[in-house]
Structure formats: C-alpha cells, structure tokens
Amino acid sequence: MEVIASLAHYYDQPLRCFTFGDFLLVPIIKEFEEILGCPLGGRKPYLFSGFYPFLDRIAKIVKISAQELGNQIENGVVGVPRKCLEEKARALASQDEWAPFIDVLALLIFGVVLFPNVDGLVDLAAIDAFLAFYNSRESPIVTILADLYDTFDHRCEKSSARIACYTPTLYVWLVSHLFRQEGRHVCPLKGHRSCIEKREASWD
C-alpha cells in the first residue's frame, strides 16, 4: 500500500500518466489483460447499465436465500458481507461442491480485489460486474482501467482520498516496469516472482 501511495505522487492528472522526470508510464488495457489473465479479445466490455441487479439473481449462484441477502445492509450500502461469502465457500468446499465454490470465490475476487468499496462488504456494483462476466462473459478490464484513472484523479483533487482498488494489480504493473530479464514472461506476475533472484533480474 505504501508503494502505491508513493506512486500517486507521480500521477499527472492532465496527461493521465505517471511522470518520472522525462520518463512517462501509462497503464494500458493490454498490460491489465495480461496481469489479470482476462483478455478482452472479442468480448463485450462491461459497462454499468444504470440499474443494480436484484439480489435473487446472485442468491441462486451463491446458494444463499434472497431474503437473507436482503437483510445485509452496512453503512446504508446493500451487499453481501465478505465473512458470509467466506463461510459459504468453506461450507461448499467441505461438501465437495466445487462448481458453486468456484462461483462464490469468483464473486469474492470481484468484490474484494477488483471492485472494493465498503470494507468487508461485496456491494451491488461488484455483484453487477460479476453477473455480467458470469452470464455474458463481459470483460471488466476497461471498467477497471477507467476506475483506476478516476481514483487517481480523485486523489489529485483530494490528497487524503484513499486508494483502495486494484492495489495488487497496480503493484504488479509497477514492478513489471521496474525489473527486466531476458525472455520476459507473457504474464508480468511470473516475471515479478522471478525478479526475486538478483542474478536474473536487473534494473532498467
């Protein structure tokens, strides 16, 4: 988190990039496709329709009653508590119900890693993005990148603003540009892991 907070100081809002003297770094779609392992390809990009989904749609997937989900409100935000989903995932794993387990795990990734909003809660915005991917295979990459720029813009306007979203992705993206080695891996995450070995990695 400290690394990302430091990175924010180098963000140039008018240019929409990070500036290091005469050197510019710009997050692009292709890089985020590789990091997240989710190529856009011919997929339709996810765009919020303006209407949040009914909870009964997600209830069928995570195997939790819609009534129970409807009672989950935190700080005025409707969603599914992370703790509730984690408990459900453990229960499904203990029963060897791997298909719904994977669905619950994917929802947790969308709510906790990709689209975090309220701590400890997977809100309706994250659920909507998950359902678009689950039902129509819509790619969240474009939305993630747009939210990333919006977050740093907000940080420029209000220095106390917290950077909560995409910090793992941003960290891998940054490290993939700081380190280089021969035969660079297609996935920057793999390159990041191998850069621990000093003899194989070098600074640009």
Locations of regions flagged by a protein language model:
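Structural stabilizers in ordered domains
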Residues: M1-D204
